[in-house]
């Protein structure tokens, strides 16, 4: 599979071959249908000060939505084919997707099932991707 990798400020993202993700215990693999580019991503690309806040190389992208591709053991809230949005920060660890761990500028990614939320059928993947970050921001304001 392919993914866009960030390596250094003021360098373009690099399209790389990336291992196909596999769901472990408590995890889901998401087939990404939409992924946003937000101010954080642009700042990471342009501001060297952000290098201390992320692990590079890293796959950027923390605003995304998609379809469950596979589920790991002990996942009961989701099944293959479910439409989901993903919380950009792990509520249990505070780890940020697309900064501290690889993000959604890829075909698929694996995340803890606790980070996924069901996306209603009347919400597009584009709307769902934008809402994951903006919704979290307004929720915590």
Give the label of every model feature segment.
Residues 1-2:
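Extreme N-terminal starter segment of soluble prokaryotic enzymes
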Residues 5, 15-17, 65-67, 108-110, ...:
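Conserved hydrophobic/aromatic beta-strand scaffold that supports enzyme active sites
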Residues 10-15, 39-40:
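Short N-terminal binding/cap micro-motifs at the start of the first secondary-structure element
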Residues 14-15, 51-54, 92-98:
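A short, acidic/glycine-rich surface segment
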Residues 39, 62, 140:
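Histidine-centered active-site/metal-ligand motif
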Residues 40-46:
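Cytochrome P450 core scaffold surrounding the K-helix E-X-X-R motif
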Residues 87-141:
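NAD(P)H dinucleotide-binding glycine-rich loop of Rossmann-like/cofactor-binding domains
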